[in-house]
């Protein structure tokens, strides 16, 4: 199957005839190849609620009727915006949907949005483990390095791992490479969350040079096959 990258942390895939998008940051994302007014999906899965991840969720969900999967707080926030089709999950939950299973796992980050000068708490930030038939995708979300990445990988060995490398807000190159080499050990590593803003500009090739497993550097609209 093919998993497509769309800049920052946004990925899409299709399984069992259902289309899934993760963290649909499209408008305002200079690297995105998608159009929020035409993208068609059945599910929107969110790691957390920062603007570069929540992105265009509200507009896409209202237009398409896609089910939004996120933390309870994030689902409640979206319900208040008129998004009716949501499924709340939390860390440790592992639910079978018609496209496959989603498990919410830890990520070490923050999770809020600011509206009219008010900070709104949106629950714990998360990583995601997708089990699609015999294939496993680990999307780390936004996170620093933490040792239980090894436990997540032992429970769910990943065919592909989407790992943030941009530093400043998440792991940088050195920590991300350590996570891949020593903790997660996926078959393929795909760097994400870099070069979208000045704060997170890094040399992606330096990450590839430090990683022992196969690295797939994707431009927006390109895919990795598992």
UniProtKB/Swiss-Prot annotation:
Keywords: Hydrolase. The keyword Repeat does not apply. It holds the Pfam family Lactamase_B_2. Transmembrane segments: none annotated. InterPro entries: Metallo-B-lactamas (IPR001279), RibonucZ/Hydroxyglut_hydro (IPR036866), UPF0173 (IPR022877), UPF0173_UPF0282_UlaG_hydrolase (IPR050114). GO terms for molecular function: hydrolase activity. NCBIfam families: PRK00685.1. Belongs to the UPF0173 family. PANTHER family: UPF0173 METAL-DEPENDENT HYDROLASE MJ1163, UPF0173 METAL-DEPENDENT HYDROLASE MJ1163-RELATED. HAMAP family: UPF0173 (MF_00457). This is UPF0173 metal-dependent hydrolase MCCL_1373. It comes from Macrococcus caseolyticus (strain JCSC5402) (Macrococcoides caseolyticum).
């Amino acid at each position: 199957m093919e998993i497509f990258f769309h800049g920052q942390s946004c990925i899409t895939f299709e399984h069992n005839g259902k289309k899934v998008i993760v963290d649909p940051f499209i408008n305002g994302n200079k690297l995105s190849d998608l159009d929020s007014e035409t993208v068609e999906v059945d599910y929107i899965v969110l790691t957390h609620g920062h603007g570069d991840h929540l992105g265009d969720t509200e507009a896409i969900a209202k237009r398409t009727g896609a089910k939004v999967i996120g933390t309870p707080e994030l689902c409640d926030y979206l319900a208040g915006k008129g998004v009716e089709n949501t499924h709340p999950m939390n860390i440790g939950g592992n639910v079978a949907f018609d496209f496959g299973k989603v498990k919410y796992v830890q990520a070490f980050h923050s999770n809020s949005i600011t509206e009219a000068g008010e900070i709104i708490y949106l629950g714990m930030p998360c990583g995601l483990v997708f089990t699609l038939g015999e294939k496993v995708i680990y999307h780390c979300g936004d996170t620093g390095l933490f040792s239980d990445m090894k436990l997540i990988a032992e429970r769910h060995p990943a065919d592909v791992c989407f790992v943030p490398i941009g530093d400043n807000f998440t792991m940088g190159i050195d920590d991300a490479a350590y996570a891949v080499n020593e903790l997660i050990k996926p078959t393929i590593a795909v760097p994400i969350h870099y070069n979208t803003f000045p704060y997170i500009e890094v040399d992606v090739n330096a990450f590839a040079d430090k990683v022992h497993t196969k690295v797939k550097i994707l431009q927006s609209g390109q895919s990795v096959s598992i």
